[in-house]
């Protein structure tokens, strides 16, 4: 099968979902750009989302909350985070009730960090030098996403937008101590260009959305390479549910960046080899748009799929027909 034929196969998978009409999710004001959505681990089906203060960044909006907890109905439960994050990008809700948010914004002495909040909105841990750059153990040149393993070990994807030569995965202990890092800028195995999203399956395998390379790379938790998957398109966001179903948001494919592929949400069972079984196309698509459209962040619970959108500045909900 050629690359073009493979793309057409993934583009033509059935779509058993429809969008909930209108702006979904009440946060008390207009939505800003958002690429960060996750599901609470307490069985409630509640949704965590971090958005960019009604704009595409929180700088100059220090009195505006950026982290929200929503019920499946869209009703607001709580919000916090004002003045702490310049550009919320990735979010992860851990099994102990912690909520982690990555900051890809930067100014002197602030940003390029990962913050852990408790349920009261208090910062209880921060990883990364404020405003730091470079590739040192605690310096992040754009931390795109965060995932915490059941063991408590912390994985951070570094290199938002493929900046410089700092494209890597870093691993920290549960108390924030550096353990190791792997990867460098490039197109080969163990190389990344804009590692944009992280997820983990029930076997503890780490999935890295290597966006600019149009692939997902799979690793064990020691950084040993396992496989490369290209069938999910150009991955901006990843989510794996409790049944090992992988959800991938492709917000950037076009004829220049990923020829033959369409933007949208691809869904496939990991236990079935990761073949795409569902494709929710991006209805806002400009076929050759150079920016981003549709879902960039992705999560799912109780039969619904949630897509966090940067371009349209909203959280979109999809339900089964």
Where does each model-flagged region fall?
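Eukaryotic scaffold repeat domains enriched in small/polar residues
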Residues: 4-321
């Amino acid at each position: 099968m050629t690359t073009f034929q493979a793309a057409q196969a993934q583009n033509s998978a059935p779509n058993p979902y429809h969008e909930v009409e209108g702006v979904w999710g009440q946060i008390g004001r207009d939505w800003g750009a958002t690429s960060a959505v996750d599901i609470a681990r307490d069985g409630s089906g509640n949704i965590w989302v971090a958005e960019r203060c009604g704009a595409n960044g929180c700088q100059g909006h220090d009195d505006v909350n950026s982290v929200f907890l929503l019920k499946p109905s869209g009703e607001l439960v709580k919000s916090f985070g004002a003045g702490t994050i310049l550009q919320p990008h990735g979010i992860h809700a851990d099994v102990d009730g912690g909520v982690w948010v990555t900051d890809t914004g930067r100014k002197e002495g602030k940003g390029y960090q990962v913050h852990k909040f408790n349920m009261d909105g208090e910062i209880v841990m921060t990883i990364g030098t404020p405003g730091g750059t470079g590739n040192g153990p605690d310096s992040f040149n754009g931390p795109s996403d965060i995932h915490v393993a059941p063991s408590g070990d912390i994985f951070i994807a570094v290199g938002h937008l493929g900046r410089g030569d700092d494209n890597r995965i870093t691993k920290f202990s549960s108390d924030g101590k550096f353990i190791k890092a792997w990867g460098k800028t490039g197109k080969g195995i163990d190389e990344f260009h804009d590692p944009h999203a992280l997820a983990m399956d029930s076997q503890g395998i780490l999935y890295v959305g290597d966006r600019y390379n149009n692939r997902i790379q799979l690793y064990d938790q020691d950084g040993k390479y396992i496989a490369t998957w290209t069938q999910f398109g150009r991955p901006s966001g990843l989510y794996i549910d409790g049944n090992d179903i992988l959800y991938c948001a492709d917000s950037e494919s076009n004829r220049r960046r990923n020829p033959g592929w369409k933007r949208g949400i691809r869904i496939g069972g990991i236990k079935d080899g990761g073949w795409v079984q569902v494709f929710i196309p991006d209805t806002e698509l400009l076929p050759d748009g150079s920016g981003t459209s549709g879902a960039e962040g992705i999560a799912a619970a109780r039969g619904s799929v949630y897509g966090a959108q940067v371009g349209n500045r909203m959280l979109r909900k999809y339900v089964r027909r």
